[in-house]
């Protein structure tokens, strides 16, 4: 899978789950499980419920996402 295959969407973190996993509600109303990307983990970027985030979805599994950006 190349980087061109990902779908980027905006969403809001609804709740924290164990192991740096979050429930994210997307703009279109769908709720997905999201995990923090490696760079965000490396730079200790904290994510709290209510934060606006950008997630990447793969076309193969639309129920899971990678959180790549937290809006200020």
Curated annotation (Swiss-Prot):
One cellular component term from this protein's GO annotations in UniProt: cytosol
SUPFAM superfamilies on file: Nucleic acid-binding proteins
Signal sequence, renumbered to the chain: none
Compartments (UniProt record): Cytoplasm
SMART domains found in the cross-reference section: S1
Lineage: superkingdom: Bacteria
HAMAP family recorded: IF_1
NCBIfam families with a match to the protein in the record: infA
PANTHER family in UniProt: TRANSLATION INITIATION FACTOR IF-1, CHLOROPLASTIC
Subunit details: Component of the 30S ribosomal translation pre-initiation complex which assembles on the 30S ribosome in the order IF-2 and IF-3, IF-1 and N-formylmethionyl-tRNA(fMet); mRNA recruitment can occur at any time during PIC assembly.
Protein name: Translation initiation factor IF-1 1
Source organism of the structure: Polaromonas sp. (strain JS666 / ATCC BAA-500)
Gene for this chain: infA1
